[in-house]
Amino acid sequence: MHVIAKKKKFRALNPVMASKNTLTRAIILTGLLAGTLDITAATIQFYLVTGKGPEVILRYIAGALFGAEVVNNQPVMPIVGLVMHYCIAMTFTAFYYWVYPRMAYLGKKWWVNGIVYGLLVWIVMNVLLVPLTRIGHRPFHLNNVLIGAGILVICIGIPIAYISHRFYSRRMV
């Protein structure tokens, strides 16, 4: 118990250390929330369209790195896909938290920024990153674009923008 008291005292005397720990925790929790919302929405949407479960989506995600032939023959690949999914969500979350204090307009209308960020995430994923993976280029279908972008706006953009806005608003007071 004495060691815990010293540790708390050290953090109180070292605001840089405390703020880095708090920021890291905020990024991790926000990334977990956004990633969970996103994979849940994608799974529900996929099930409603195909009748298939989340394993197919998670294998698809892993297939971006390993290729479909490897992914379909390995039972561990849905777990790999889930880990990859959360790594991507954490990356987009950390980037937003990094950009937020550097761009003054992000603090003004968090909900507009959330919509814009969700659309930006869709563009980065579907126009830049996915075509570079083993999945390759996919055909354009407006309905799929609208649904996918909508999911990313609601599940990634808005939650990240809202939570990071609250995080930084509390620190600037």
What spans do the regions from the language model cover?
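Interfacial helix-loop-helix junctions of multi-pass membrane proteins
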Residues: 127-147
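Alpha-helical transmembrane segments of multipass membrane proteins
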Residues: 33-42, 88, 92, 117, ...
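Hydrophobic alpha-helical transmembrane segments
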Residues: 79-97
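Short, Lys/Arg-rich, polar N-terminal cytosolic tail immediately upstream
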Residues: 1-20
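Extracytosolic (periplasmic/ER-lumenal) interhelical loops and adjacent juxtamembrane/interface segments
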Residues: 47, 51-78
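Internal alpha-helical transmembrane segments of multi-pass membrane proteins
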Residues: 102-123
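N-terminal signal-anchor transmembrane alpha helix
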Residues: 18-51
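Hydrophobic cores of alpha-helical transmembrane segments in multi-pass inner/ER membrane proteins
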Residues: 2-3, 151-165
